[in-house]
Structures are given as structure tokens and as C-alpha cells.
Amino acid sequence: MTEVKKGRVVDDAPVNDAPENDAAEVTSPARHDAIPEEARQRAAQLRADLERHNRLYYELDTPEISDAEYDVLYRELVGLERRWPALRDEASPTQRVGGEVLEGLEKQAHTLRMYSLDNAFSRDEWGAFMQRMYNALPDAPSAFWCDPKMDGLALEVIYENGVFTSALTRGNGEVGEVVTAAMRTVRNLPLALRGDDVPRRIEVRGEVVIAKADFEQLNARQSAAGGKLFANPRNAAAGSVRQLDTTVTAGRPLQFLAYGVGQVVLEGGTAPWTTHSGLMARLREWGFDTPPEGRLCASPDEVWAYYEALGARRESLAIEIDGVVAKLDDTEAQEALGFTARAPRWALALKFPAMQARTRLDDIRVQVGRTGVLTPVAILEPVRVGGVEVSRATLHNEDEIRAKGLMLGDMVLVQRAGDVIPEVVRPLVEERTGDERPFVFPENCPECDSPVVRPQGEVAHRCVNVMCPAVRRQSIIHFVSKAGLDVRGVGERWVQQLVDGGHVTSPVGLFSLTKLDLMRFERMGPTSAANFVTALDAARTGATLVRLICALGIRHVGEQTARTLAANFTDLDALREADAETLQQLPDIGPEVAGSIRTFFANEGNLELLERLRAIGLWPKRQDAPPAPEGADAIVRPLQGLKVLFTGSLTRVGRTEAEDMARAAGANIASSVTKSLDLLVVGGKPGSKLEKARKLGIRVMEEADFFAMLESAEMPAEGSDAAEVPAPSVEDVDAKEVPSRDVAHVRIVHDGTASDPGGDSRSVAEDAPARSTEGDAVSTAEGEDVPRGRAEQLKLF
């Protein structure tokens, strides 16, 4: 359903935080204070952490933290950006939907971007949302369409002349994975729409789910066949749709539940609905199943009553849900309210409290990570929480164990907020028998028996033995993991087996393995061994500097910091020579991060590893940018500090590669056309972004001139001969090619005229005014007044 998945940001700006474009309503005497360095560093670290957890959750289906922990990190970042607005960045998880599309399936752009909803966790937050809505639109109607917030895989199915033609996963909101063949096997998905009034083209958005009873049967079949059990229905649904072998998908009990539409192209006439409830009725007439329990609520109080009633019955429902989605039913009011940069101002996800269960804390085991951090893990008597069997939960550190007062043998309360990773909430002290025992944190590493230390100011205990087998094992696993070099086809279990067996003692050792070496292992046949070696060789020759820096596992250096370093230094030699002062001149790098980088390169063992990597040819250079001078000059780039945006079809390279080249030249990549944009680079059929940039007086550069500028490392002066692109007329662009609009996620097109219909809140489009009636002006999502005029396309929700 909506992209508000289990409290993940991309989707979940807390409702009591003002939306981006309402920032002026929030006043604080300290808004313009100088930003302390520690605040800048903390914001950068939070962004990196949130982006990583977004990727683990949305793309890899392997979350490492609970929703509650994620929400704490997210709200902390929101608070920092509110306290110091200059910290706010368009690439921040608080400003955009996160996540990148996985490799392995064909990728395709959504006609209209799929956005998300803000959320609320209490009645006060629901009331604050309503107050903001009525402040913005005093005469807003009070009826809301409400339905359950399902926990599945969001995607879009497309119909041409009533016939199913394609399907895309949500992906990163702009580009999804093509899963047409898999979706054809979903039994309740109509392959042809019913009725005579079907649109010429329609994009229907919804959620793929597996019912609880079907999930239990699926896992029973998996167990009987000796297969891997699924953690929860969401993971099973997501994995089933992404199968390349559609016979596997066909054997899975998937359902598609429609909740809204994207682009709608009509032959003529007027829009077929003017409310969201009307849209839902029309979807059912066309043959779609819609979320169960959906209903129209006449007032905000009725919405809350619906939320409480549904929450009380959630365990008895056929599918897993974790909240309620409430949307203003009237589409004209929706358009008047508009959007922030991330979400509609007229819709909200009301989240249920975490589900809880009682169980016994049997033991606490301590694990050692790749940086030597000792992490205590609760070993629980297995218990079902939210449809999933829970037997382990991280306790993070010794301080948390003490703060919660946990003892071995305690009965404890465990919760799982729709996530895979559970949390021990508290001990049930009233049930203690006297047989419980205190837990003593080990003074020696459980893997190598070396003394552990707790550095001053830190909560973590660390094993400082660089030869610790656990540290070595986890470091090598990290090196080839998706968070490191991202070696496809080399699984963690194989790496662990190779390390534990003494066959590999460093990351370099993996690259020296031969097919014959690997075939000595049980279940490693000729084909698997060949694929293993091929994958490693492809990673070695195709590695980027960003991925290698990530793979090294330098403390405090996540992917965002790695991108910054890779954009400003030619290779690891140049980075090694940079002193702390030079490093701190780079964005988001403060004394702590700079010190960590210098410490890494001062270690003899690390330097030996780097030389061995160089010897096997794993030594990438910075891509598509001139060599970096030494010292402080290393941060000077032709696009240094400029905000750049690409639009239209690029012919020389793909969009992602072009953005990487711009970053390497010092640019920050923007997500939309705003007054703060410095440069718009246009390819073929640029559409409305070009028109908007011209209105705002933003510099425009053709694709060829942009790449010529990068190659010469010289930024053309203002008013130079860089040609601008003529603006296309409406007649030159068909309904599929006209870019999406800021205030809408549904576009209805018929015979060059527009009508005034409705749609769904879970997706928003880019780059156009909110409404299109003659005569007056309207505010865009960026807060600018744009004259109203004849609409070539109409927006629905």
C-alpha cells in the first residue's frame, strides 16, 4: 500500500513536526545560530545511518533495527534540522523517499513519482495535523476516507485499453523494477478490466500481500520441503514478486489490493469521480479487490474511533496491518491544500502501538562485530509476536541491560512494531521468583579471550585485538557485502565457512581462490565455484572508489562520507596523504571522522592490506573528474557547492552515472526545481522542469555542453554561449511524456482538455502548480505563486 512502511522515514515524518514548506510557521530564537560542529557531524551521521537502514529495509528486506529505534533516529535528525535550518539538505531522509532499485530486474521510470505519507502515533498528533489543515484551508470538508495500512509490497499495475500490460515495484519512488510476468500469476489481479467505461490508459497502485492463514500454510510447505522459512508475510510477498522464475511466484498465495491510481488517460468527457471514496468504488467495479474494512468517516472524531476499533481487532484480521490511512475525501480540497516536498498535507498514516507478548529471558550472549564492538543479544523462549516467532533480540550494550534492570530468567515483555527485529521492553518484576540471576558483562572477548575496553565517552565495549577471529571474520564478510564492495553471488555463509576453516585470512585471500579450491567444499559444484570466482573477479575489476572505501570499514565512514571522499581524492594514496585539517574542510566531516580516517591510515596492518589490494589490481581511481591536488586544494571542483538537476533523456550516459559525475565535480544533486537550484542540465524532451527553471531564472545547460565543461574542468561564465533548449509545446508531447506535477500523483488526460477529478495520497508528482483553473494564482510545493492557466493534465488523489 502506501510507502509508509513500518515507520520508515522515507515515509514517516512525525506529524507534530511542521512540513518542509511550512517551516516559516515554526519560530525559534535560535534558528539562525551558528551551527556547532558537533551538531553538523551528528546530522551527517544520522543521515548516513538512516539511509543505510532504509536500504536494508526497502531494498534488501533485512532490517537491523526496530521501528521504534528508527523513529528515535529520525526524530533526532528532524529536531536538528529544525533547530539549524542550514543543516537541511534535499538529500536528507527527512526530505525524500529513500532507497535505490535492486539489480537483477529490468528498471523502468514511473510516469508519476510514488511518494509517501507523514504519520502520527497519538490523538494529540492527529489533532495537530487537523489544526494545520484547517489553518491552511478553513473551509475544508471534514469527511475522510479511511482504510487499513497494509504491510506488503507497494507497486503499480498498468492497463492499456482495459488490458493489463505491465507492473512496476515502487523502487525508489521514481524508478521501479519491472515485475510484469510475476504479477500475471497473481490470481486476483484482473488481466482485463470490466465495464465499457475503462480509461485508454490507467496506472493502478496498490499492495501485494499474503494473508496470515496463507502465510502459515506457505511456511509449512517450505518446512516440509526443507526450504528456508519466511520471517513474516511482508518478506514472503516481496520475495515472491521479485522472483525471476515466475513458476515460483505462481505457487505463492499472493493478493493485490488496490488503493489508488497514478496517471489516467481518458478518451473524452468528464472525470469519473470527484472523491476518493468514488475512486475506490470505481476500482471495485473494474474488478479490483480493495483493502478490507475501508470506509468513509464523516468527521475527525469518527476517524479516531475507526482507528481505535480497528486496532482492537487487528489480530483477528485476515492480513497484517500496522495502522490506518486517513485521506481527506474531497479532491478539490486536496488540491487546494497541496503537498510538502515529501507528502500530502491532507492525508496521514495513524500508526498502531507496537504489538507485545510475554516470554522468558533464558540467556544473554555476547557477539563480536567487525569493529570489535561487543553486542549483547537476548536469548528468549520462543514466542509469537505479530505473527512472527521471536527467539532473539538485541540489547545493544551493557548500559541498556542495566537501565532496563534485566536479569537472567526474567519474564519479559517483548514487542515488534511490524518489524523483523524485536525489542525487549522491560522485565516483569512482579513475576520474579527469586531464582533470577544478574548478568555480568564479560571482561574478556568471548572469541579470543583478550581483555575488552570501554573507551571514555562510549557505551560500547570493544575487543582491541586486531587478530581476533570474530573481528577478522566480520571484516571480511563486510568487505564483500552489499554495504561494502557489493560482490553479487558471494554469500555470507560461504565467506564465514572459508574464514572459519582458515582458508581465507584477509579480504585479499578471497580473490586468490580458484575454482578447484572451492570445489573441495561440500555443495560447491563446478558451476557454483565458477560463478563464485567470476563474481569476485568482476567486483575486483569493476569496483569504484566509493565502494572500496565503504568496504574498508573505516570507523564513522558510511556510504555518504565515502562518496564525499571519493569525490575529492583521486585514489586511496591521495586520501592517505590528506591531513586532518584538509579532511575537515570537506562537507559533513568533523574532527571525529577525520581522526578516524587518519587512524586507519596510520595502522601498519591496514597499509599492508592496501598494498595487497593494489597488487591484485583492486585500486580504483576517482571517476570522470580531473586529478585532485594535494592538501586543501583537493576540494576545489568545477561544480563545487552548486546544486545541479538533470531532466529529459540523456544520450551519453544514464541518469545515475551523470549524477555521479556531477558529484565528483563537487555538485550537490537536487531532486526538484526550486529557487535554490544553480544549474539545470537538459537532455531530450525535458518537459516542465525546463519551463519552470526559465521562470525562476535558473541557468540551463544542454547535455553536450555539460559534459564538455566537465572534460575541460571549466565552468562556463554566466551569459556564455551554452545553448538553451527550446520549450516544447503541449502538442509536441503526448500524455506519457509530459513530466509529472508537484501537487498531483494522478494525471487525467483527454483530448487536450482537463477535468477536475480525484485519486490517492500515496503518490505525488512533480513540477507543476497545484490547480489549473483560469484566473488566479496558486502556491506550489515550493511555496511560489504560479498563475493558473489552461491545464493540459489534471491531478487526482
UniProtKB/Swiss-Prot annotation:
Keywords: DNA damage, DNA repair, DNA replication, Ligase, Magnesium, Manganese, Metal-binding, NAD, Zinc. GO terms for cellular component: cytosol. Residues 1-11, 733-750, 785-797 have a biased composition (Basic and acidic residues). Pfam families: BRCT, DNA_ligase_aden, DNA_ligase_OB, DNA_ligase_ZBD, HHH_2, Nlig-Ia. Residues 1-32, 715-797 are annotated as: Disordered. It is an enzyme of class 6 (ligase). Its cofactor is Mg(2+); Mn(2+). Zn(2+) binds at C445, C448, C463, C468. NAD(+) binds at D67, A68, E69, Y70, D71, S116, L117, D147, R170, E207, K327, K351. It catalyses: NAD(+) + (deoxyribonucleotide)n-3'-hydroxyl + 5'-phospho-(deoxyribonucleotide)m = (deoxyribonucleotide)n+m + AMP + beta-nicotinamide D-nucleotide. GO terms for biological process: DNA repair; DNA replication. PROSITE patterns: BRCT, DNA_LIGASE_N2. InterPro entries: BRCT_dom, BRCT_dom_sf, DisA/LigA_HHH, DNA_ligase, DNA_ligase_CS, DNAligase_adenylation, DNAligase_N, Hlx-hairpin-Hlx_DNA-bd_motif. SMART domains: BRCT (SM00292), HhH1 (SM00278), LIGANc (SM00532). GO terms for molecular function: DNA binding; DNA ligase (NAD+) activity; metal ion binding. SUPFAM superfamilies: BRCT domain (SSF52113), DNA ligase/mRNA capping enzyme, catalytic domain (SSF56091), Nucleic acid-binding proteins (SSF50249), RuvA domain 2-like (SSF47781). Residues 634-723 form the BRCT domain. DNA ligase that catalyzes the formation of phosphodiester linkages between 5'-phosphoryl and 3'-hydroxyl groups in double-stranded DNA using NAD as a coenzyme and as the energy source for the reaction. It is essential for DNA replication and repair of damaged DNA. HAMAP family: DNA_ligase_A. This is DNA ligase 2.
